[in-house]
Amino acid sequence: MTILGIDPGTRKMGYALISLEKGKIALIEAGLIKIKAEELQFQIPQMVEAFEGIFKNHKIDEVAIEDIFYAHNPKTTIKLAQFRGAIMLMLIQQFGQFSEYTALQVKKALTGNGKATKEQVAFMAKRLLNIKKEIKPLDITDAIAVAITHSQRVRLKQQ
């Protein structure tokens, strides 16, 4: 089974594809989608095009996305919500469904602590996947963590 994890953002989005076979997880691919356009009306199609490339190149069985958080700037929160709405529509059209996890759920799933730092989550994501090299930026490890969190839920359902 291939799981796509997404860490949404307004300028850059982390994504990660992991495989789940016989209870074991492995990283297939992870990366960053950079949004270069300045206006929302051009940013969203740019993001959709990037994801369509990922969908074409991989057989994806399950998708998980990190839920929205409240930013200190209301404009940023609104823009992130608009991007998530576009992503959600795209995922429903492509896969029929997707799962959502809050940052707290992801942190707890990987570290056991809902107040873990991004660096602690990144450390555990790399450890669980036996990755030795550094992965930057943290948007990528956040997406990996979302995918791992979903893999844990899938494993529980299979038992």
From Swiss-Prot:
What InterPro entries does UniProt report for this protein, alphabetically? Answer: RNaseH-like_sf (IPR012337), RNaseH_sf (IPR036397), X-over_junc_endoDNase_Mg_BS (IPR020563), X-over_junc_endoDNase_RuvC (IPR002176)
Positions with a binding annotation for Mg(2+) 2: 66
Report the locations given in the UniProt record.
Cytoplasm
What Gene3D superfamilies is this protein classified in? Ribonuclease H-like superfamily/Ribonuclease H (3.30.420.10)
Active site per database record: 7, 66, 139
**Which EC class is the enzyme in?**
hydrolase
Q: Does the keyword Transmembrane helix apply?
A: no
- Keywords, ordered alphabetically: Cytoplasm, DNA damage, DNA recombination, DNA repair, DNA-binding, Endonuclease, Hydrolase, Magnesium, Metal-binding, Nuclease
Q: Which reaction does it catalyse?
A: Endonucleolytic cleavage at a junction such as a reciprocal single-stranded crossover between two homologous DNA duplexes (Holliday junction)
The EC designation for this entry is 3.1.21.10
Question: Record's superkingdom?
Answer: Bacteria
Report the cofactors.
Answer: Mg(2+)
- Details of cofactor binding: Binds 2 Mg(2+) ion per subunit.
Which residues does Mg(2+) 1 bind? 7, 139
- GO biological process entries: DNA recombination; DNA repair
Q: Name one GO cellular component term.
A: Holliday junction resolvase complex
One MF annotation (Gene Ontology) recorded for this entry? DNA binding
Functional description taken from the UniProt entry: The RuvA-RuvB-RuvC complex processes Holliday junction (HJ) DNA during genetic recombination and DNA repair. Endonuclease that resolves HJ intermediates. Cleaves cruciform DNA by making single-stranded nicks across the HJ at symmetrical positions within the homologous arms, yielding a 5'-phosphate and a 3'-hydroxyl group; requires a central core of homology in the junction. The consensus cleavage sequence is 5'-(A/T)TT(C/G)-3'. Cleavage occurs on the 3'-side of the TT dinucleotide at the point of strand exchange.
Describe the protein's quaternary organization and the partners it interacts with: Homodimer which binds Holliday junction (HJ) DNA. The HJ becomes 2-fold symmetrical on binding to RuvC with unstacked arms; it has a different conformation from HJ DNA in complex with RuvA. In the full resolvosome a probable DNA-RuvA(4)-RuvB(12)-RuvC(2) complex forms which resolves the HJ.
Task: Give the record's family classification.
Answer: Belongs to the RuvC family.
Write down the PANTHER family for this protein, in alphabetical order.
Answer: CROSSOVER JUNCTION ENDODEOXYRIBONUCLEASE RUVC
NCBIfam families named in the record: ruvC
Please identify the protein, giving its name as recorded: Crossover junction endodeoxyribonuclease RuvC
Native source organism of the sequence:
Sulfurimonas denitrificans (strain ATCC 33889 / DSM 1251) (Thiomicrospira denitrificans (strain ATCC 33889 / DSM 1251))
